Amino acid sequence: MVDGIFWRIEPEPPPPPFPPPETILIPAGYHLGNVLLHAACVLAAFVLGRRLLGDPHAALLGALLFAVHPVHAENVAYIKGRTDLLAAFFLFLAWARLCRPARRFDVLTPLLFLAALLSREGSVIFFPVAFLTRWWHAGDGFREAFRRTLPLGALAVLFLAFYASLGPPAAYREGSFTPEGGWPALLLGLECLGTYIRLLCWPFSLTADYIGLETAPRDLVSVGLGVLALAVLCLIFVRLRRFLAPGRAMGRFVFAFACLALTLLPVSNLIPIKALLAERYLYFGSLPVLLWIGAWLAKRAPRASACALVLVLAVLSAARTLEWRAEKPLWGSCVRSLPWAWRAGLNLCNAHAEDSSLPATVRTRRALAAADLGLRANPAASELWHEKGYVLLLAGRPGDALPPLRKAHSLAPRDPQTRFLLIRSLALLASVQPAEARKAL
């Protein structure tokens, strides 16, 4: 993982006194930083587990599950996941301080929350989690819990107001996911909740990209898990309140999954969002669930069974990390796991097209096959038509590149790169087949 290559940066010479590009492009330091941050998050998770559970053995087991769970491989192996690691580290420390007895004035907790906000905008969701912790888990009254978490709420409101004044990020202005209303949105939300629960409890079908979920057929198993989770929570709230004390197993169960649901609210991704569902969103919210599982195993399961579970998760996490070492195995596994994930086909096409170790004909054939896989999942993806035309143009086939480039231009007429490739294809075709070029023009 430390010497993986999943890192891209434009090799332009930076101004002094920054290091030269050949130093910037060495990924070992970046990956090692992520590994160390993950280790720090595990230590902070152990401290938080001791405060929440009151049992060091259960907290240790929960922290170990958090450390080796394969759903966190994306956050650690992908350098871009550093934002989630930093935010989770500060939030775990703030959460642990919040579990301490009330003090007249606490400066460090708001500062830790501010550091998390500056690391990742989705940290604003910590405010309702903090309120739930004081009101439910710590047993404070409603007013006392609100008074204790008021500085966090004020920081969250000020940060959101400032962030909204800047406008949406440029990367999100186009191509963002826009949810439908009514029953389709409800089913999609239930499927997302069920998918997250399935990924935590059965991490055997992980993938790097879930874009395309909104257009794929509904997964009835995930929808059923989402419905079951909501039904159980509602039943417990309405009929079984006496079992919801923090010291009871049922109370810990509901508290853990309530915190998970809060962290997965749309506000945690600051709509409009680029990805409706992603494993990296689980890094912070998975901890209370894994702590609850650790507490249950510490009391009910033999020690050998708990150690075996940790070992199995560690093996799965190691295998998942190996996929993140390079793009072709990563996107290849994604295409095999989720045929509807059209962007995985696009990324696999890019990976094959840039693989200089293969002969040109083999490289072109594999790239086109990957693009066709993505187009079967989403024929309206202009990026796939663009990439297919680009691959054909690189292969010296401007005539074959014209149809996919025309299709890409019709789907995204404002894309300057597609226009450039279309003009380039026509120019190359004019030097070889003037009649065909005039007809195309």
What is each stretch, according to the model?
Residues M1-P359, R363-L394, Q417:
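Polytopic membrane enzymes that build or remodel cell-surface glycoconjugates and lipids
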Residues N350, Y390, R424-S431:
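Residue-level recognition of tetratricopeptide repeat
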Residues S357-L358, L426-A437:
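Alpha-helical linker/edge segments of TPR/alpha-solenoid repeat scaffolds
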Residues A367, A401, A437-A440:
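Single-residue signature of alpha-solenoid repeat helices
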Residues R397, R406-S410:
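Tandem repeat domain/solenoid detector
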Residues H409-S410, I423, A427, A440-L441:
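TPR/TPR-like (Sel1-like) alpha-helical repeat modules
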